[in-house]
UniProtKB/Swiss-Prot annotation:
Alphabetical list of PANTHER family matching this protein: NADH-UBIQUINONE OXIDOREDUCTASE CHAIN 5
Organism: Fagopyrum esculentum subsp. ancestrale
Enzyme class: translocase
Coiled-coil regions listed: none
A Pfam family matched in the record: Proton_antipo_M
Subunit structure of this chain's protein: NDH is composed of at least 16 different subunits, 5 of which are encoded in the nucleus.
One GO term describing the cellular component: chloroplast thylakoid membrane
Keyword Thylakoid: yes
Membrane topology recorded in Swiss-Prot or TrEMBL: Multi-pass membrane protein
Domain of life: Eukaryota
Name recorded for this polypeptide: NAD(P)H-quinone oxidoreductase subunit 5, chloroplastic
EC id: 7.1.1.-
Protein keywords: Chloroplast, Membrane, NAD, NADP, Plastid, Plastoquinone, Quinone, Thylakoid, Translocase, Transmembrane, Transmembrane helix, Transport
Amino acid sequence: MEHIYQYTWIIPFIPLTVPLLIGAGLIIFPTTTKNLRRMWAFPSILLLSLVMLFSTKLSIQQINSHYIYQSVWSWTINNDFSLEFGYLVDPLTSIMSMLITTVGILVLIYSDNYMVHDQGYLRFFAYLSFFNTSMLGLVTSSNFIQIYIFWELVGMCSYLLIGFWFTRPIAANACQKAFVTNRVGDFGLLLGILGLYWLTGSFEFRDLFEIFNTLIYNNEVHFLVGTVCTFLLFAGAVAKSAQFPLHVWLPDAMEGPTPISALIHAATMVAAGIFLVARLFPLLIVTPFILNLIALVGIITLFLGATLASCSKDIKRGLAYSTMSQLGYMMLALGMGSYRAALFHLITHAYSKALLFLGSGCVIHSMEAIVGYSPDKSQNMVFMGGLKKHVPITKTAFLLGTLSLSGIPPLACFWSKDEIINDTWLYSPIFAIISWATVGFTAFYMFRIYLLTFEGHLNVHFQNYNGKKSSSVYSISLWGHEGLKPINKNLSLFTLLPIKNNESFYKNPHGDIKKTIQSFLITNNCDNKKIVPYPHESGNTMLFPLLVLIIFTGVIGFIGIPFDQENMDFDILSSWLTPSVNLLHLKLNNKNSFDWSEFLTNATLSVSIAYSGIVLASFLYKPIYSYSSLQNFALINLFAKRHPKRFFSDKIKNVIYDWAHHRGYIDAFYTRYIIRSVRGLSQFINFFDRRVIDGIPNGLGVTSFFVGEGLKYVGGGRISSYLFLYLLYASIFLLIYYFDFTNININFTDQ
């Protein structure tokens, strides 16, 4: 068995072959490499498949033997300091390796078709392979030095991938925003690593955990110092996993290609923060204040992400806020001490969210054939609707992902999310109520996305191809029904969608549909003009990953279902994670026991809340298919708008939408109070440096220059002039000497 583990070090370097070969090919044979660019998808998929097979073998060994293997090479700098590099194989390593490789392979297959017409095809696959290398190196690291190196490489890859289309200003700004925001967390991570090394004298995880715990238990180090160090480490995870308050980069990161959104923001990069907290869990157990802080950050993030996702027009940004919310569930579980539940939800969410992102990519891909390449249109749900008739496979895949994320049994996320919610009752009833309410929010915003995208009519047919609105039907309210009035662009704090003159929020929602539907649109797609009456299903290489992810979404949740209550390792996941600790169960002296009646009671309530969210979304966003239905709806609306409570509810809706549209005003707060302050300080420092610090030597230099220039013209080359000046200076010197000598004699005489 050990001979398998000893080759684990090669795992991160296998995918690295692809970017090296692509770079060498572009240098040596640039024309041939570019002409045969699609050939590079095959080695990318093949090499990552080899890593997946190796990771699968390691996972099977971990489930059967629970063997932890570590290998270290020591690089001695001097007698007092030794730098060590190595790798660690444990259950957490095997789980993350499986996630990275399985999702990575599917994304590579999907990207071959999705990026086929992009000029940066080779660059895209080089970035993807290098990103996989960085993530695999991160999860196999055995010490903080390697963690930090690969942590920064992951951040660099995310910067390159988010800004892949860097010629678009919005994409360039998004990658800079992600980079700077993550630098804040990375600086905290670096300080925490240095602080722990100062306390323990080691970078190796196993030695560091043992020494730190001993110091805390024996009161050999001040508790505040240890708490500050662990808090700084947690700051790195907050930024990388888009937790409050460093979550602001995640929605803007959707400016990258959709496969990047599936890979980075579903299974890998944003999960790196969860991985770091899980890796440091033995360290956090002895600092309960930090665990409580982690739980607090998690509960704020999951609720904030759910509220912000409820009004998003962009399909990818809505899924990004959803990712932020689900990562909050994982962080909450880790803060409560529910290690198993956090990793369980990490697994189930990765496959479900990858399915949703790739499904949204198929939707965007089909919409681009009609609206052209314009993310503002192809990703805007206002232009969508009725796609279930045109992309049925994508619709089915997206629906299953939506049901899973909403917590509907027996799909994957139901099992993991309910386990977290059950544990919140043992930790804090307030947190349990918030997490339960967020289940309803999750079902609401996910079915809102589904209904606006796939149900009803294709809304892009209600406008001309040149973008001019031909009917009021085009202006679709974000609350579900179409509105006559266009959205007011004069945004204010509480009146994003103002209602004036006692108008109803749903007043006169429809015009004459028969006069607005156009039969077809002529677009320029891939340099070939052709008639594209409706969106079309994506190619097989884009649909195949969806089908595989459907299988994962359906069956992956069963690895955490208990089947034998007599045995402690009663399910695959518990056996995989052995030994693992649930602090909540230890407090109740309830070790690894499972109460099916309690689980079913809590599950029934959570599923009921989820169905309530689905019903609410269906009520607000239910499509209207016939003209008679439009007339009936207008008649109902005529009576409803006269009710005085209607105006109050409309104001509440506008306030909620204003909050979501402005991202909770957190970005505005940062811009006004932090970014402007830092920019003003930078401008002052720049002024002081250039005008004062540089002004002193520059002023002396300029003065010397002009004095020299003046003296240069004093002498004309005549000896008589030199003698005159000599005698003049000598006379002045003698006069000064005479008066000084006279004053000295007078003072001496007076004394």
